[in-house]
Swiss-Prot record:
This protein's encoding gene: gag
Protein name per Swiss-Prot or TrEMBL: Gag polyprotein
GO biological process, one term: viral budding via host ESCRT complex
Residue numbers covered by motif PTAP/PSAP motif: 202-205, 287-290
Ranges spanned by the short sequence motif PPXY motif, renumbered to the chain: 208-211
Listed Pro residues bias regions: 119-128
Keyword set, alphabetical order: Capsid protein, Coiled coil, Host-virus interaction, Lipoprotein, Metal-binding, Myristate, Phosphoprotein, Repeat, Viral budding, Viral budding via the host ESCRT complexes, Viral matrix protein, Viral nucleoprotein, Viral release from host cell, Virion, Zinc, Zinc-finger
Organism name: Sheep pulmonary adenomatosis virus
Annotated Gene3D superfamilies: 1.10.1200.30, Human Immunodeficiency Virus Type 1 Capsid Protein, Retroviral GAG p10 protein, Zinc finger, CCHC-type
Length: 612
């Protein structure tokens, strides 16, 4: 059987089944019997469920085990237990035997008219079990004693009659119908009246619930009788279910009165999730927000009694708002009651407000269907007349776009929150456009900044449609390659988009090729170019300037003249004219002789120029 729990359960079921047939067997013997079956038949069902076919296979396996190992390996009571359980599982034969007994009883007269009816004696035992009349002498003759010993020796050599199934003549359906008719006629002749289906009998107490097998085996305690069903309103049913599921229903604590079982109507419970969302909407968005009003309209389609509306309003509204709603609700009910009085409708003011003789909830459950529609209409109209709560906008600041969230999803969340708070569509769109830019992430803000005052919300969504995680990775890689921050890269793209450089087909500088500036303002354009020296013209040996050449010979080995320190003369100056007294030196050829030179001549005076 596997587990101990399943073994005990199966033993208990076998014990009950055998006891039903008048056979008492101890549980110890049944446990030993099942242990032997587990040893012989390892495939025996572990779930403890058997039928007649399975039990026959068990018998064949026991027979094989007996043939191979002999009678010493088979307990004595195994054959008896197997036969008894086989008879319990063979339901068809049991029913046929009962029908046969009924047929036999039908053939005998039930009673005589002049005598008191008496019970028939039990049917005689089958011929195989009939005992011979006992003699006074209990001793057996030698012949009978020898025959008994011979039969006992052949006991284990028989072909196991317990495996053979009795095959009696099956009773057809027509025979059973005919038998039932004969029994009915016999009962009528005997003066016994059969109960008619039209007679009404007092209702019997409900049967106890069907116990599970574990309870029947004594492993689990039996469950108690179910409490009598109570008719509750839809709100009270919803709160019952929520309390069983572990929800906190402290705000609806007045929803569990005692009821009488005198109502035959059928009621459905409200989903507690709807009530919970209504309370959250009233606390976050206000009682007159569009989202809250939509939930009240949905709740108004249910047939709620007045006490349910009062309890819902008390739990969802503040103290002041509840008093305002209650006074407005009573006023609406008074108007409806006046109209009902004029139209001859039997729905009074006390019924609509649930006061006076209609204060109990079980009494309110017996109203006419039209009364619930009027009560719901009055409750909805009173709810709509509560003061608006336009100051509940603190949650809008929490609606921000995540770093990897698509922009369209962020705008959808923003519009949903604004729609629950503001009823004016135009004002809501203006606020949505403002928050769609301010609460967006840095990448979307950089893309939307040039179009902040030009485009609308649809343009914002179209511009930021491609901005996602891959876009942010590209911006980060560009910033790393250029050695700039992400903010500088975004500003650079914004400036490029603003100047329209993308339309020119080249977004970089024509001089240096770097993005971010034009060729006119390129910083590399005004830098002085540094020329590198070529082959030296003096020595023809290396690349250096001639003024830096220090070679003595040229490339062919010819000696080079020495380089003076200032052989590179500068740019010749223009001749200067000195006005005033000048010393005129005669132009004479250079004399290389050693003769003494002539003395210098005297100074001469020259008139000043006309103009300076």
């Amino acid at each position: 059987m596997g587990h101990t729990h399943s073994r005990q359960l199966f033993v208990h079921m076998l014990s009950v089944m055998l006891k039903h047939r008048g056979i008492t067997v101890s549980k110890t013997k049944l446990i030993n019997f099942l242990s032997f079956i587990e040893e012989v038949c390892p495939w025996f069902p572990r779930e403890g469920t058997v039928n007649l076919e399975t039990w026959k296979k068990v018998g064949e396996q026991i027979r094989t085990h007996y043939t191979l190992h002999g009678p010493e390996k088979v307990p004595v009571e195994t054959l008896s237990f197997w036969t008894l359980i086989r008879d319990c599982l063979d339901f068809d034969n049991d029913e046929l035997k009962r029908l046969g007994n009924l047929l036999k009883q039908e053939e005998d007269p039930l009673h005589t008219p002049d005598s008191v009816p008496s019970y028939d004696p039990p049917p005689p035992p089958p011929p195989s079990l009939k005992m011979h009349p006992s003699d006074n002498d209990d001793s057996l003759s030698s012949t009978d004693e020898a025959e008994l010993d011979e039969e006992a020796a052949k006991y284990h050599q028989e072909d196991w009659g317990f495996l053979a199934q009795e095959k009696g003549a099956l009773t057809s359906k027509d025979e059973l119908v005919e038998c039932f008719k004969n029994l009915t006629i016999a009962l009528q002749n005997a003066g016994i009246q059969l109960p008619s289906n039209n007679n009404t009998f007092p209702s019997a107490p409900p049967f106890p619930p069907a116990y599970t097998p574990t309870v029947m085996a004594g492993l689990d305690p039996p469950p108690g009788f179910p409490p009598p069903s109570k008719h509750m309103s839809p709100l009270q049913k919803a709160l019952r279910q929520a309390q069983r599921l572990g929800e906190v229903v402290s705000d609806f604590s007045l929803a569990f009165p005692v009821f009488e079982n005198n109502n035959q109507r059928y009621y459905e419970s409200l989903p507690f999730k709807q009530l919970k969302e209504l309370k959250i909407a009233c606390s976050q968005y206000g009682p007159t927000a569009p989202f809250t009003i939509a939930m009240i309209e949905s709740l108004g389609t249910q047939a709620l009694p007045p006490n349910d509306w009062k309890q819902t309003a008390r739990a969802c509204l503040s103290g002041g708002d509840y008093l305002l709603w209650k006074s407005e609700f009573f006023e609406q009910c008074a108007r409806i009651a006046d109209v009902n009085r004029q139209q001859g409708i039997q729905t009074s003011y006390e019924m609509l407000i649930g006061e006076g003789p209609y204060q109990a909830t079980d009494t309110q459950l017996n109203f006419l269907p039209g009364a619930y529609a009027q009560i719901s209409n009055a409750a909805r109209q009173a709810w709509k007349k509560l003061p608006s709560s336009s100051t509940k906008t603190e949650d809008l600041s929490k609606v921000r776009q995540g770093p990897d969230e698509p922009y369209q999803d962020f705008v959808a969340r923003l519009l949903d929150t604004i729609g629950k708070i503001m009823s004016d569509e135009k004002a809501g769109m203006v606020l949505a456009k403002q928050l769609a830019f301010e609460n967006a992430n840095s990448a979307c803000q950089a893309a939307l900044r040039p179009y902040r005052k030009k485009g609308d919300l649809s343009d914002f969504i179209r511009i930021c449609a491609d901005i996602g995680p891959s876009y942010m990775q590209g911006i980060a890689m560009a910033a790393a390659l250029q050695g700039k921050s992400i903010k500088e890269v975004l500003f650079q793209q914004q400036a490029r988009n603003k100047k329209g450089l993308q339309k020119s087909g080249n977004s970089g500088c024509f001089v240096c090729g770097q993005p971010g500036h034009r060729a006119a303002v390129c910083p590399q354009k005004h830098q002085t170019s540094v020329n590198t020296p070529n082959l030296c013209p003096r020595c023809k040996k290396g690349k250096h300037w001639a003024r830096d050449c220090r070679s003595k010979t040229d490339v062919q080995g010819n000696p080079l003249p020495p380089v003076s320190g200032n052989w590179v003369r500068g740019q010749p100056l223009a001749p200067k004219q000195c006005y005033g007294a000048t010393l005129q030196v005669p132009k004479e050829p250079l004399q290389t002789s050693v003769e003494p030179q002539e003395a210098a001549r005297d100074w001469t005076s020259v008139p000043p120029p006309i103009q300076y």
